[in-house]
Swiss-Prot record:
It is found in: Cytoplasm. One of its GO terms (cellular component) is cytoplasm. It comes from Pediococcus pentosaceus (strain ATCC 25745 / CCUG 21536 / LMG 10740 / 183-1w). Excises uracil residues from the DNA which can arise as a result of misincorporation of dUMP residues by DNA polymerase or due to deamination of cytosine. The active site is at residue 65. GO terms for biological process: base-excision repair, AP site formation via deaminated base removal. Its EC number is 3.2.2.27. It catalyses: Hydrolyzes single-stranded DNA or mismatched double-stranded DNA and polynucleotides, releasing free uracil. This is Uracil-DNA glycosylase. SUPFAM superfamilies: Uracil-DNA glycosylase-like (SSF52141). One of its GO terms (molecular function) is uracil DNA N-glycosylase activity. Keywords: Cytoplasm, DNA damage, DNA repair, Hydrolase. Belongs to the uracil-DNA glycosylase (UDG) superfamily. UNG family. InterPro entries: UDG_fam1, Ura-DNA_Glyclase_AS, Uracil-DNA_glycosylase-like, Uracil-DNA_glycosylase-like_sf.
Length: 230
């Protein structure tokens, strides 16, 4: 079978790729990409896994659905491509980062530097129709990404899971809390950020947890200028 992901995630998820539900999802996506405007483009669907190999994951920031605007999504939760306006939820993440660690917001939303350090920016659904939020829910992505979450939870080296909002917190049942760290709060969207996201200090809490595990903390400071890397 041809490789779908070009690192150790391929072995972790190989069993899922061989399931009937994944074959059905694949056929659904072939039709969707042929007939609809789908985000991200098909070459970036698995970008979160490509940039953050299974063995390198230290932190997971769970999202729900890719951004559904033009040129936004590139396969990572909350992140947008260079040159695209920073979405409101990410603006609020930057505000909390400044409040928590004194890191001033950058003028882009490209989070590759986080991914490169072991922050898996994973959406539970990996594709979406243009302008139609949640349009690809219930077609099989959730089963695949739930398997990824469980595999990380069971891995020998523990992980910090950052869960923002109800949809992310619903994944707690997949995580062994006796060995992994869960940091949870309201979602950073403008609708809910003031209900417990602001002031939750997820970035410093994550680094404290990593240091307690003997891991190097994340450098959350993003570069001021970026170019897209394939």
């Amino acid at each position: 079978m041809k490789k779908i992901i070009h690192n150790d995630w391929q072995d972790v998820l190989q069993g899922e790729f061989e399931q009937a539900y994944y074959a059905k999802l694949h056929e659904f996506l072939k039709h969707e990409y042929a007939t609809q405007n789908i985000h991200p483009d098909m070459y970036h669907i698995f970008q979160a896994f490509e940039w953050t190999p299974f063995s390198k994951v230290k932190v997971v920031i769970l999202g729900q659905d890719p951004y559904h605007g033009q040129n936004q999504a590139h396969g990572l939760s909350f992140s947008v491509q260079p040159g695209v306006q920073v979405p409101p939820s990410l603006q609020n993440i930057y505000k909390e980062l400044q409040s928590d660690l004194g890191i001033a917001p950058v003028q882009h939303g490209y989070l590759k530097k986080w991914a490169d350090q072991g922050v898996l920016l994973l959406n539970s659904v990996l594709t979406v129709r243009d302008g139609q939020a949640y349009s690809h829910q219930g077609h099989g992505w959730e089963r695949l990404t739930d398997t990824a979450i469980q595999a990380l939870s069971e891995r020998e080296q523990p992980v910090v899971f950052i869960l923002w909002g109800k949809a992310a917190r619903d994944k707690i049942k997949l995580i062994d809390q006796s060995r992994n760290i869960i940091i949870q709060s309201a979602h950073p969207s403008p609708l809910s950020a003031y209900r417990g996201f602001f002031g939750s200090k997820p970035f410093s809490k994550t680094n404290e947890a990593l240091e307690a595990m003997g891991e190097t903390p994340i450098d959350w400071q993003l570069p001021t200028e970026v170019l897209e890397e394939k």
